[in-house]
């Protein structure tokens, strides 16, 4: 994995010698940004952007509690098609309000039995405030407040569906999860670098009669964009998740923690009216998590 990432970065440097840009200059190439990592600059006052995503996930296996990879049994299959919409609105030139909804279709084949269910996943509400502008070696710095809203089905599982009817987030369905984070972006012409850290705090929820408290979890993301002529760009991204053991009826559930690390290269094309990106995501390591391969396509349009 590290060899692949190293070769990717080396290739970028060979393509063009970088000229490091002061963040205060007027180099602002249009871009859809990374897939998961936030970009720190917020929307201009009164501007609205809409960003739909189409995501196709194929599960090749899973990482168990010890981080060991186990492939799916022969003949078993799991896949998912997600459609997401992220909308952002600039309240002021430094403050924006965002919302994200998810609709998903789950497909499972287990020992020859096929299951298919669809429905809303969990939704998210965000507000972001830009504290610092990109200047000198200081990155654009933005604070994030977010709330996960449990709009996806999380209980009363149909045992004949092998879990296909459950639509809650992987960090725990059914809970309201407030979160707080920080986001950085830095222009280093012809590169743009982004990073974020977001800590979330799930609230207790009753699931099928059991008092369930999912552990706090941390999302940590980093991405780099490399801008080419004619509106093209290359993107590389790493996404991490760490979550502790959950509690059910007051007792800790051993080995219920979740960890994952996802690698994603992508290519984009953008102009001043529309920004596009196609990427491949692969979960390369984890614990108690699905080992997914994903194709992601997205574009941004601003009104």
Predicted feature residues:
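Short edge beta-strand segments in beta-sheet-rich domains
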Residues: 140, 215, 292-294
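Cleavable N-terminal export/targeting peptides
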Residues: 1-28
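Transmembrane beta-barrel domains of Gram-negative outer membranes and organellar outer membranes
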Residues: 21-153, 162-203, 210, 217-223, ...
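A generic alpha-helix preference that emphasizes hydrophobic side chains
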Residues: 16-18, 124, 296
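A short, acidic, flexible beta-alpha connecting loop/helix-capping segment that sits on the rim
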Residues: 280-286, 292-296
């Amino acid at each position: 994995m590290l060899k692949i990432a190293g070769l990717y970065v080396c290739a970028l440097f060979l393509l063009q010698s970088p000229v490091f840009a002061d963040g205060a200059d007027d180099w602002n190439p249009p871009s859809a940004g990374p897939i998961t990592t936030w970009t720190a600059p917020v929307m201009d006052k009164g501007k609205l952007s809409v960003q739909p995503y189409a995501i196709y996930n194929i599960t090749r296996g899973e990482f168990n509690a010890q981080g060991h990879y186990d492939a799916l049994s022969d003949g078993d299959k799991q896949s998912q098609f997600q459609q997401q919409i992220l909308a952002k609105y600039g309240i002021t030139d430094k403050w924006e309000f965002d919302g994200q909804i998810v609709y998903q279709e789950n497909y499972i084949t287990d020992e020859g039995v096929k299951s298919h269910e669809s429905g809303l996943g969990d939704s998210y509400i965000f507000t972001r405030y830009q504290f610092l502008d990109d200047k000198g070696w200081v990155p654009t710095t933005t604070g994030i407040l977010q709330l996960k809203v449990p709009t996806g089905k999380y209980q009363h599982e149909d045992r004949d569906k092998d879990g296909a009817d459950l639509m809650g987030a992987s960090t725990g369905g059914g809970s309201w999860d407030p979160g707080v984070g920080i986001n950085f972006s830095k222009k280093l012409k012809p590169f743009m670098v982004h990073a974020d850290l977001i800590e979330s705090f799930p609230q207790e929820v009753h699931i099928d009669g059991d008092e369930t408290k999912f552990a706090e979890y941390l999302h940590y993301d980093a991405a780099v964009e490399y801008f080419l002529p004619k509106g093209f760009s290359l993107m590389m991204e790493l996404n991490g998740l760490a979550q502790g053991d959950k509690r059910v009826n007051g007792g800790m559930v051993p080995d219920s923690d979740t960890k994952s690390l996802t690698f994603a290269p992508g290519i984009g094309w953008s102009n001043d009216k529309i920004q596009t990106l196609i990427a491949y995501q692969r979960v390369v390591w984890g614990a108690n998590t699905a080992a997914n391969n994903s194709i992601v396509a997205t574009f941004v349009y601003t009104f």
